[in-house]
């Protein structure tokens, strides 16, 4: 049986693995599922149709699975789904999805949500991401894997952040950030490549050089984006890291930060 502090309120219909720990004064609703090895600290609220995988840790005063801050929301049965090994720090808020956004907010595994950050309805967060203190994702934002957002940054709704991108502190992001890039400012602009992040993620020197050349063609060559894409396909297509960059740009709807 899960270890539940006597002051916590866990609905009898909630499904908690026997190794789950729930701290003082926390509240867990009837549609909540929490996987093995997860730890819920004091004064946490987990509600709605929320599913947490294994070994997640939720710190005090976090709000997980609350209704979306969307005036169109009318009580539809939507959900929040998290994978494994996530850390949700103090005063973080993660909201469930809306019917108009696919019905779910989805979070992968191995992510760190630092204190006071917010993930809005219908966001998709990949694996190995970091969101800094006080930063916020508006609704329908997509973060690919291994994206880092520093503190006090904000991301506009429907924006996409490419994998291994780095968003500097205080940035206001209103357009898609391409994979591997570093962006900063209000409104955010590209200032270089996240080389340190790529090295830490195990990219080879050859892969990093190809990414550098791809970014040079796209963002430093004075070509139009269409012209740069033609050149990029001709010179560097066929390598997975470049092919992903090409695909990301092709799928952009908000436009690309350059």
UniProtKB/Swiss-Prot annotation:
Record keywords: Acyltransferase, Cytoplasm, Lipid A biosynthesis, Lipid biosynthesis, Lipid metabolism, Repeat, Transferase
InterPro entries recorded: Acetyltransf_C, Acetyltransf_C_sf, Hexapep, Lipid_A_LpxA, Trimer_LpxA-like_sf
Catalytic activity: a (3R)-hydroxyacyl-[ACP] + UDP-N-acetyl-alpha-D-glucosamine = a UDP-3-O-[(3R)-3-hydroxyacyl]-N-acetyl-alpha-D-glucosamine + holo-[ACP]
Pfam families: Acetyltransf_11 (PF13720), Hexapep (PF00132)
Record GO cellular component, one term: membrane
One of the record's GO molecular function terms: acyl-[acyl-carrier-protein]-UDP-N-acetylglucosamine O-acyltransferase activity
Enzyme class, spelled out: transferase
Pathway(s) per entry: Glycolipid biosynthesis; lipid IV(A) biosynthesis; lipid IV(A) from (3R)-3-hydroxytetradecanoyl-[acyl-carrier-protein] and UDP-N-acetyl-alpha-D-glucosamine: step 1/6
Subcellular localization(s) per the UniProt record: Cytoplasm
Signal sequence annotation: none
EC assignment: 2.3.1.129
Keyword Magnesium assigned: no
Domain of life from the UniProt record: Bacteria
SUPFAM superfamilies recorded: Trimeric LpxA-like enzymes (SSF51161)
A Gene Ontology BP annotation from the UniProt entry: lipid A biosynthetic process
Record carries keyword Hydrolase: no
Primary location recorded for the protein, binned into one broad class: cytoplasm
Coiled coil: none
Binding partners and assembly: Homotrimer.
Known role: Involved in the biosynthesis of lipid A, a phosphorylated glycolipid that anchors the lipopolysaccharide to the outer membrane of the cell.
Family the entry assigns: Belongs to the transferase hexapeptide repeat family. LpxA subfamily.
HAMAP family associated with the record: LpxA
Protein name: Acyl-[acyl-carrier-protein]--UDP-N-acetylglucosamine O-acyltransferase
Origin organism lineage: Bacteria, Pseudomonadati, Myxococcota, Myxococcia, Myxococcales
Gene transcribed to yield this protein: lpxA
